[in-house]
Amino acid sequence: RINTTNNMKIFLDTADTQLIRKYYGTGLIDGVTTNPTLIMRSGRDPEEVYQEIEDIGLRDISMEVMGDSNEMIEEGIRLATKFPNSATIKVPCTPDGLLACAELSMKNLIRVNVTLIFDVAQAILSAKAGAAYVSPFVGRLDDNSIAGLQLIKDIDEVYRVQAIHRTRILSASIRYVNSVSQSFANGADIVTMPPAVFDKMYNHVLTDRGLEIFDEDWKKTQEIISKSA
């Protein structure tokens, strides 16, 4: 399977706009995923959160809709109309969710993220329904003694064999830095993660020790220079 964008993408999984603003400033964040739980924790109106994220500069914000297929379609169209530059409508991988996905993506040309993917079969149905993204829940599978990263690999293999290029794999429910690198290694196009995990991607004990050594040696060099002056 060919990654047509020739690059990996990193999304933040949060509705905390202060953290989004902070990490967007790194130039390394490509999008944001939200869900009802994250919105509830923010204590804010969902659309206020979406608007602020868009104002920060993000152009790919997963906005989850709930209800039956008609309700999800109606709400998805409304959100995509209100946020035409950033909305990705997020639906669950259920019969109603996939009906909504097909209507939104194929008839209304709206970007859809099908979430709560726990099996390759669900990823196949989502691709058939025109999903822009499928979101396998790596961490939640691992919690239940099922190899979440293997699911990423299996979905990628099916998509590659069937030449499915439109639907991209968005690895979700990430708990550890290693899951980020392994998601990409196993075929994910995008990984969404909590800000705390993104922050830890910078850190390694050997990097920290190397910086300490460089700092110590730099100070010694400065002392030598000052003595010889």
Positions of predicted regions on the chain:
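Conserved, mostly hydrophobic/aromatic
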Residues: 35, 89, 126, 183, ...
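Alpha-helix-loop-beta-strand connector modules within alpha/beta enzyme cores
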Residues: 47-61, 98-110, 148-169, 213-225
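Active-site-adjacent beta->alpha loops and helix N-cap segments on the catalytic face
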Residues: 41-52, 69-74, 91-106, 119-127, ...
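Catalytic cores of alpha/beta
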Residues: 18-25, 74-79, 100, 119-129, ...
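Glycine-rich phosphate-binding active-site loops on the catalytic face of alpha/beta enzymes
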Residues: 36-39, 116, 132-144, 188-207
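Glycine-enriched alpha-helix->loop->beta-strand junction motifs that scaffold or abut catalytic
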Residues: 27-31, 58, 83-85, 103-112, ...
